[in-house]
Amino acid sequence: MIEIVYKENKEQANGNEGYFHLPKNIRQVGDTNGRERIYLEDYVGTFLKKYFSAPEERAAMLFGEFKWADGISYFFIRSAAAIHTMEPAPDHLVFDDAVWTEVHDVMEKYFKNQQILGWALSLPGYGEDLNEQIIRAHLNHFGGNDKTLFRVNGQEKEETFYTYEGGTLRSTGGFYIYYEKNEPMQSYLIDQNQNRSI
């Protein structure tokens, strides 16, 4: 199901967060469950599709902002970066010091005002299931309700977001793609294209 929505909603957040704006120009992908609303910026989605079109296993980090209002978790994924120092495999997912150094260097250079929202993983030929290694890696490094996992699964390149619920990772069912000016991600992509082929 794809739906294009043009609206300007202002949501009241709980705590000290104040108000936040939902993106105006969005497109829904899949059926969302209502408890989480994941907004993926279009440049980020384009980058992840291209990066994960390679035949080898790859991982990336997701950056942006997390908000909570009226019992709903809002993930605004504004940026993503390839993790070049990691060699993911279905039975081997290591977030060592080299990975975190790379991630924090990228954050410092391109995405200073954003937080880590989770990670993305592509394991071509492995299938759609989340094995114990994937779940353990997520819970060890991205535990909590404010982090997500984005998987690109199988031959059809099915895109699925997962969040922590009930002691494990569960699919959110769908997400939203939104469109806005995204200079930090554009700068990252320009530098990546100049330095290496993705």
Model-predicted regions and their roles:
Residues 1-118, 124-197:
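N-terminal beta-strand/alpha-helix entry module and adjacent surface
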